Swiss-Prot record:
Gene Ontology terms describing biological process: nitrogen utilization; uracil catabolic process
HAMAP family tied to this protein: RutC
GO MF assignments: deaminase activity
Domain of life: Bacteria
Lineage: Bacteria, Pseudomonadati, Pseudomonadota, Gammaproteobacteria, Enterobacterales
Swiss-Prot/TrEMBL catalytic activity: (Z)-3-aminoacrylate + H2O + H(+) = 3-oxopropanoate + NH4(+)
Entry's EC annotation: 3.5.-.-
InterPro entries the record matches: RidA_CS, RutC, RutC-like_sf, YjgF/YER057c/UK114
Keywords: Hydrolase
Purpose: Involved in pyrimidine catabolism. Catalyzes the deamination of 3-aminoacrylate to malonic semialdehyde, a reaction that can also occur spontaneously. RutC may facilitate the reaction and modulate the metabolic fitness, rather than catalyzing essential functions.
Similarity remark: Belongs to the RutC family.
Gene3D superfamilies: RutC-like (3.30.1330.40)
Protein name (record): 3-aminoacrylate deaminase RutC
């Protein structure tokens, strides 16, 4: 089955050759998402909660553009720059997944911009 490119209205141009999301066979693949403004500047430097909220709101827009909801999320890959932000990120994360939680993993690493604190890539299965 062919894939569909998912680009929500108002999305900024990516820094590299990719799109915000793709849809294939009822599965939405959301690219790694950071807290960027329309010009790819990092938002909310030094605020892991605000960055996480912005990232998850952006992911929600991609999934909703594809016809799904956050309840359809089955897996998240979470990249953080410092373990000291783990609890703050989890606090906001829990607001977006109040029911059954998706599977996920965390990894500490450097991100594309120094002020970025969290990046999340997502997979969602949309019921037909």
């Amino acid at each position: 089955m062919p894939k569909s490119v998912i680009i929500p209205a108002g999305s900024s141009a990516p820094l590299a050759p990719f799109v915000p999301g793709t849809l294939a066979d009822g599965v939405v693949y959301v690219s790694g998402t950071l807290a960027f403004d329309q010009h790819n500047n990092v938002l909310f430097a030094d605020d892991p909660k605000a960055q996480t909220r912005h990232v998850l709101e952006t992911i929600r827009k991609v999934i909703e553009t594809a016809g799904g909801t956050m309840a359809d999320v089955t897996f998240n890959s979470i990249f953080i720059t410092d373990w000291k932000n783990y609890a703050a990120i989890n606090e906001i994360y829990a607001e977006f997944f109040p029911g059954d939680k998706p599977a996920r993993f965390y990894i500490q690493c450097g991100l594309v911009k120094p002020d970025a604190l969290v990046e999340i890539a997502t997979i969602a299965h949309i019921a037909k």
